[in-house]
Regions:
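Conserved lysine of the Walker
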Residues: 103
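Hydrophobic positions on the alpha1 helix immediately C-terminal to the Walker A/P-loop
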Residues: 106
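A noncatalytic interaction/capping subdomain that flanks phosphate/NTP-handling catalytic cores
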Residues: 1-99, 109-118, 127-237
Length: 237
């Protein structure tokens, strides 16, 4: 059994294999769980059938467990976003793009450009929590043990200030996205639930988020000038 705290939620994961315990080191908590999860043998086999490669049962259990957490967390106004979130000067910026477009490259360029002022919160699948404040809302990005192939991230949280929707280009350019563009890009990076109630919970959060956190189309290359284009448009304001 693994007891951890993610996005302010104490979670109990009833695991069969040690992989999960190793993965979640540094996130442990002694608080009473608000969510309890387990993965059945049938769910493991279903996950195996969805994979192109051959993975151990222990690894597949970690994948299944995070997917189940993503769905259960919706009731706590938390969802998983396929993105790389970096913190610069206390503010959070999320890079969204199809796999292979350059999220990791841009993340590393930002780390190089901003040096000690920057850190990666989660390089692959952060948890996003909506915190309502009277007539407004804040969206916090949280690090998790699930950090992708590169293993970039930490057990920390940051307030999201902007989304960058990455597109490859020769000459860098950063422009404000419409809300319709933001919704389209964000939806492509979500785990969509099958249950109606969970889908309604997710849709409400996304609607509020695109009204609260601005999105930008960042046409970028693999050079530092892409960071400067984003910085001049968003970060230094």
């Amino acid at each position: 059994m693994v007891s951890i705290k993610l996005a302010e939620i104490p979670v109990q994961m009833n695991n069969r294999y040690p992989d999960l315990e190793y993965l979640c080191q540094g996130y442990e908590t002694g608080e009473k769980p608000e969510i309890s999860l387990s993965v059945s043998v049938e769910e493991l086999e279903k996950e195996r059938s969805m994979q192109d490669e051959c993975f151990s049962d222990g690894y597949l259990e970690t994948v299944c467990m995070y997917r189940k957490l993503a769905l259960e967390a919706l009731a706590h106004q938390v969802f998983v976003l396929h993105a790389s979130v970096i913190e610069v000067g206390g503010n959070g910026y999320a890079f969204l793009a199809p796999s292979g477009t350059g999220k990791t490259t841009q993340t590393r360029l930002w780390l190089e450009y901003f040096g000690e002022d920057a850190r990666v919160i989660n390089g692959d699948k952060p948890l996003i929590r909506m915190i309502k404040k009277d007539d407004s809302a804040e969206f916090m990005a949280y690090g998790t043990p699930w950090q992708g192939k590169e293993g970039m991230g930490c057990n920390a949280a940051v307030s999201l200030k902007a989304f960058f929707f990455l597109e490859r280009a020769v000459e860098p350019e950063c422009i404000l996205a419409t809300q319709e563009k933001s919704i389209d890009c964000i939806f492509r990076q979500l785990l969509l639930p099958e249950k109606t109630e969970q889908m309604e919970q997710l849709l409400e959060m996304i609607d509020i988020m695109v009204e609260t956190v601005p999105g930008y189309v960042l046409r970028c290359n693999m050079e530092m000038e892409s960071v400067k284009a984003a910085y001049d448009t968003v970060v230094k304001q």
